[in-house]
Swiss-Prot record:
PANTHER family documented for this protein: ACYLPHOSPHATASE (PTHR47268:SF4)
InterPro entries: Acylphosphatase (IPR020456), Acylphosphatase-like_dom (IPR001792), Acylphosphatase-like_dom_sf (IPR036046), Acylphosphatase_CS (IPR017968)
Class of the enzyme per the UniProt entry, highest EC level: hydrolase
EC number, as in UniProt: 3.6.1.7
Protein name from the UniProt record: Acylphosphatase
Pfam family, one: Acylphosphatase
GO molecular function: acylphosphatase activity
Source species: Vibrio vulnificus (strain CMCP6)
Similarity-based family: Belongs to the acylphosphatase family.
Gene3D superfamilies: 3.30.70.100
Active-site residue numbers: R20, N38
UniProt keywords, alphabetically: Hydrolase
Length: 90
């Protein structure tokens, strides 16, 4: 089974609205591992690793985010895989 890792940077109203919590929950639901963390500029960085189809499904979810957030922009890039345990909120 191929594993892919991607880094996402989500911009918009994504801090202080439960975005990382919902992102972690969605990642776990899709059997992904990685993390979500706030950046100093107001964006959220998300690393997700798992099956390519699940990564695509996750990316579609990130484009919308939870109802409490407003996603204005989603940047993504494939990165070298590392070992993560679970889906952490940093």
């Amino acid at each position: 089974m191929a594993i892919r890792c991607e880094k996402f940077v989500v911009s918009g109203i994504v801090q202080g609205v439960g975005f990382r919590y919902h992102t972690s929950h969605q990642g776990l639901k899709l059997n992904l591992v990685g993390y979500a963390k706030n950046l100093y500029n107001g964006d959220v960085e998300v690393i997700a690793c798992g099956e390519p189809l699940k990564i695509e499904e996750f990316a579609k979810w990130l484009e919308q985010g939870p109802k409490t957030a407003r996603v204005d922009e989603l940047k993504r890039e494939e990165i070298t895989c590392r070992e993560y345990q679970g889906f952490e909120i940093l």
